[in-house]
Amino acid sequence: MSCCGGNCGCGSGCKCGNGCGGCKMYPDLGFSGETTTTETFVLGVAPAMKNQYEASGESNNAENDACKCGSDCKCDPCTCK
């Protein structure tokens, strides 16, 4: 298993994303020295939009629904269509 510990994310086209930053990518998990404060602001909420295919009964699943990143930072299994 890589030092990422499975901290990878599948990106577009079933390629592994750049979520794997290597060892100690999360400072609050055993790495200390600096304190970081993060603030999040929610500026608005958009209305729900209906899918154009909804009436015809077609399914529009997200491209990466079936992708998972394995321990070696490669997608496994990749069954995207």
UniProtKB/Swiss-Prot annotation:
Induction annotation: Strongly induced in seedlings by CuSO4.
GO biological process: intracellular copper ion homeostasis
Alphabetical list of InterPro entries matching this protein: Metalthion_15p (IPR000347)
Highest taxon of the lineage: Eukaryota
Keywords in alphabetical order: Metal-binding, Metal-thiolate cluster
Tissue: Abundant in leaves, inflorescences and roots of mature plants. Also detected in roots of young plants, and in siliques. Expressed in leaf mesophyll cells, filaments, stigma and tips of elongating lateral roots.
GO molecular function: copper ion binding
Protein's job: Metallothioneins have a high content of cysteine residues that bind various heavy metals. Functions as a metal chelator of copper (Cu) and zinc (Zn). Plays a role in Cu homeostasis, specifically in the remobilization of Cu from senescing leaves. The mobilization of Cu from internal sources is important for seed development.
Family statement drawn from the similarity comment of this UniProt entry: Belongs to the metallothionein superfamily. Type 15 family.
Protein name, per record: Metallothionein-like protein 2A
Naturally occurring in which organism (per UniProt): Arabidopsis thaliana
Species lineage: Eukaryota, Viridiplantae, Streptophyta, Embryophyta, Tracheophyta
